[in-house]
């Protein structure tokens, strides 16, 4: 994994697959939902929020404004769309989606944990 060139998309893909096959892991972004889509015991989650909530959160945490947020979101969308052929933000690409402007981050974490645990149990019961 460490022998890869920084920024190499093939390295990122291979690293995500190796780590996922090694054991439990959490990946944020980098098209991990797409890369791991054929792994049965993988749970992909999409976290989203309404624009006003995101704008306030970005300002609170990073001191950034909506213009910077919009640019960063466009970059993420372009990256995801280019490497997957799917549309970034389409909740149909995921097992589970949570609107984090409607629940606390702690509640979201609990929902994810319970969903993943139930999914694993259902896979074992088959």
Across the structure, where does each feature detected by a protein language model lie?
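Short, amphipathic alpha-helical "lid/cap" segments that border enzyme active or binding sites
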Residues: 13, 105-113
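Single conserved hydrophobic/aromatic residue that forms the stacking wall/gate
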Residues: 1-7, 11-12
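Small-molecule kinase domains that catalyze NTP-dependent phosphoryl transfer to phosphate-bearing small molecules
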Residues: 64-106
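Conserved phosphate-donor/acceptor-positioning beta-strand/loop module used by diverse small-molecule
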Residues: 38-62, 66-72
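Loop/turn-to-beta-strand initiation segments
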Residues: 22-25
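Short loop/helix-cap segments at secondary-structure boundaries that form the rim of catalytic
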Residues: 34-39, 91
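Short, polar loop motifs at secondary-structure junctions
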Residues: 29-33
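C-terminal helical "lid" subdomain and adjoining coupling/linker elements of P-loop NTPases
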Residues: 119-126
């Amino acid at each position: 994994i460490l022998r890869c060139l920084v920024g190499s998309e093939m390295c990122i893909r291979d690293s995500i697959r190796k780590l996922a096959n090694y054991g439990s892991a959490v990946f944020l972004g980098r098209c991990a939902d797409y890369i791991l889509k054929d792994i049965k015991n993988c749970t992909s989650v999409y976290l989203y929020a309404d624009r006003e909530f995101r704008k306030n959160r970005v300002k609170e945490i990073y001191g950034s404004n909506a213009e910077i947020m919009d640019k960063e979101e466009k970059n993420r969308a372009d990256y995801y769309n280019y490497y997957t052929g799917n549309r970034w933000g389409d909740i149909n690409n995921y097992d589970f989606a949570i609107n984090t402007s409607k629940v606390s981050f702690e509640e979201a974490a609990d929902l994810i944990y319970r969903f993943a645990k139930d999914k694993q149990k259902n896979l074992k019961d088959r």
